[in-house]
Amino acid sequence: MDNLQTLFDHLYQGKPLTREQMAQVFSTIIQGDMQPATMAGMLVALKMRGETIDEIAGAADALRQAAKPFPRSDASKQSGIVDIVGTGGDGHNTINISTTAAFVAAAAGAKVAKHGNRSVSSKSGSSDLLSHCGIALTMAPDAASQCLDKLGLCFLFAPHYHGGVKHAVPVRQALKTRTIFNVLGPLINPASPEFMLLGVYTLELIEPIAQVLHALGVKRAMVVYGSGLDEVALHDNTHVAELKDGVVRTYQLSPEDLGVNRADIAQLTGGEPADNALITQAILQGKGLPAHRDAVAINAGCALYISGICDSVQAGTQLALATLASGTAFTLLTDLAAASQAGEHNE
């Protein structure tokens, strides 16, 4: 164990920390043992230099190790599970594309454990939307695991599993700037998914985050930046860093590559959680606007590809479109709402 002050001095001098040293620093944060001023200085020092892959992985290690355990069945370990998640912070108040896509991917055969939170930077985060769809956020881990096995989908509410992160909230709010915490959320899913479709808020992050996912043991992933969006874009090209067989390759995908027509980003503008819940329900019933349907389908399609359900993103998108037309994804939403109410865990 290194002396913490020595580690802080390293950071203030612009020197990187090892993965193990960073895990030690973040363990101190989530135990509530770091002074706010020290935490602020550390977060800003990291931001000014730029976090390394080892530092991000080490911070994620600490948070994952401290999380409330999520029990995985043998069946889910054999099939593998996928998360569809974004860092947020892209500045566009769109409809809840990744959350809606999670229902579609699950209805099409993937096992989806979506890790989400209430909104920080937009009007409606995934958990805000789910509440309005009648889905209880505080399911006991055992009940959520059963939903994953029986329905192919569960939602894991971040504060329910990561209680220690609350110690950083006042400092993050006071700093009013992005810090390493903005990229940690998608990396600390307590279900430890083997596959990930992860959207980021800037192009510069796609390759480093793909390398972090590899370091954390993720088998296959697409880290995407959709021309201003933290998801696969319908309005323009999407930059992709794909992790497969331990190798990261980068490329671009256009909406046309995915088999859909591009649409202006204004067509994806969302509203308050109640509005977005109605939009999601319409999409899942096969009654959504064409741009809404296609935006959800291309994201669900990429998730179906990386989880091995489909051999290409194009095939995944076609399966997602067929699933939306069938209405089975809406049935899944109602089934999950009923199961979540039964499995709610009040603390």
UniProtKB/Swiss-Prot annotation:
Gene Ontology molecular function: any one: magnesium ion binding
Binding residues for anthranilate 1: 86, 117
Protein name stated in the entry: Anthranilate phosphoribosyltransferase
Keyword Transferase: yes
Positions of anthranilate 2 binding: 172
Binding site residues for Mg(2+) 1: 98, 231
Keyword terms: Amino-acid biosynthesis, Aromatic amino acid biosynthesis, Glycosyltransferase, Magnesium, Metal-binding, Transferase, Tryptophan biosynthesis
HAMAP family assigned: TrpD
Pathway field: Amino-acid biosynthesis; L-tryptophan biosynthesis; L-tryptophan from chorismate: step 2/5
Described function: Catalyzes the transfer of the phosphoribosyl group of 5-phosphorylribose-1-pyrophosphate (PRPP) to anthranilate to yield N-(5'-phosphoribosyl)-anthranilate (PRA).
GO biological processes: L-tryptophan biosynthetic process
EC numbers on record: 2.4.2.18
Keyword flag Metal-binding: yes
